[in-house]
From Swiss-Prot:
Its cofactor is [4Fe-4S] cluster; [2Fe-2S] cluster. It comes from the Bacteria. [2Fe-2S] cluster binds at residues 113, 144, 204, 276. Signal peptide: none annotated. This is Biotin synthase. It comes from Actinobacillus pleuropneumoniae serotype 3 (strain JL03).
Length: 336
């Protein structure tokens, strides 16, 4: 098997990367330690240098194959190893997926993300999802897939089918990765990310906060994302949704200011990436989400469900956007 390692910028590099610097973990920690208002202000300045601060990219996420995943990730209700009451389902029919995509576009989404609860797809799965990708792409939607670990040639097949983005999160600080995920390691993630880049696909890569990590460990997650070379085009920042039956169901609540800080630090360290305010928004008051947008979040998951968990309804999101004078970003082939 060929191993593709997504290059991490080396500490020995004295000249910054043309588009991104190397971020030492201690430097990222210093950002987290800034006075809250100063941090938000700095992040807002960086955001305005690269984006229209009123524009929000809307993505709809659909689970096309739910439950029964053989992986053991302590945050995930889809693992077959946990009793969460979620039943394993077969893959959705192509026609049903396409209908969901049409609805998403009609409601204003510009990107359609499809997820499957696999450790990794089999060749026959790639054939099926490639057909789906082609049809969804023809609707005028940007396409994203999250299908797990990829074997050689699969990323190229997905690219050929018309996939724009591949989502593969780093989840948490590399130093604590195997405290959270027990059936794969950080290098496995990096290998698939390397294959995705090698195939010419754009990368969607983020993580989850609120899993009992410390602030330095949150800094480690952001540093690991910011030091991917090149940086991810999309960075979803998820707040843990605590699901009964998972090992993290009783995780300590993350203070809301710490989540906003994480958004701000992601914006500063990855100035040209779309920073997505991702899972956990149902528990976020409008004022908190507003601060996240001020701090540089410029993408949300849009639709009533995120894989298996609830998400704000479209009407409430549009109402909030109207209050804040935000507008949905239209899809153009040149967009990130």
């Amino acid at each position: 098997m060929t191993t593709y390692n997504l290059r991490l910028k080396a500490k020995s590099e004295l000249t910054p990367h043309p588009t991104a610097q190397y971020w030492r973990k201690c430097q990222v920690e210093e950002l987290f330690e800034m006075p809250f208002m100063e941090l938000i202000f700095k992040a807002a300045q960086v955001h305005r240098e690269h984006f229209d601060p009123q524009a929000i990219q809307l993505s709809t996420l659909l689970s096309i194959k739910t439950g029964g995943c053989p992986e053991e990730c302590e945050y995930c209700p889809q693992s077959a190893r946990y009793d969460t009451g979620l039943e394993k389902q077969v893959m959705m029919d192509v026609e049903e997926i396409v209908e969901k995509a049409k609805i998403a576009k009609a409601r204003g989404a510009s990107r359609f993300c499809m997820g499957a609860a696999w450790r990794g797809p089999k060749p026959k799965d790639i054939k099926v999802v490639s057909e789906i990708i082609g049809v969804v792409k023809a609707l005028g939607l940007e396409t994203c897939g999250t299908f797990g670990l990829l074997e050689d040639g699969m990323a190229e097949d997905l690219k050929q089918a018309g996939l724009d983005y591949y989502n593969h999160n780093l989840d948490t600080d590399p130093e604590r990765y195997n405290k959270i995920v027990h059936t794969r390691n950080h290098d496995d993630r990096m290998d698939t990310l390397g294959k995705v880049r090698h195939a010419g696909l754009k990368v969607c890569c983020g993580g989850i906060v609120g899993m009992n990590e410390t602030r330095p460990e949150r800094a480690g997650l952001i540093a690991s994302l910011a030091n991917l070379d090149p940086q991810p085009e999309s960075v979803p920042i998820n707040q843990l949704i605590k699901v009964e039956g998972t090992p993290l169901e009783n995780a300590e609540d993350l203070d809301w200011t710490e989540f906003v800080r994480t958004i701000a630090v992601a914006r500063i360290t990855m100035p040209k990436s779309y920073v997505r305010l991702s899972a956990g928004r149902t528990s976020m008051p409008e004022a908190m989400q507003t601060l996240c947008f001020m701090a540089g979040a410029n993408s949300i998951f849009y639709g009533e469900k995120l894989l298996t968990t609830c998400n704000p309804e479209e009407d409430s999101d549009r109402l909030l956007m109207d209050k804040l004078d935000l507008y949905p970003l239209a899809y153009e082939p040149s967009d990130a």
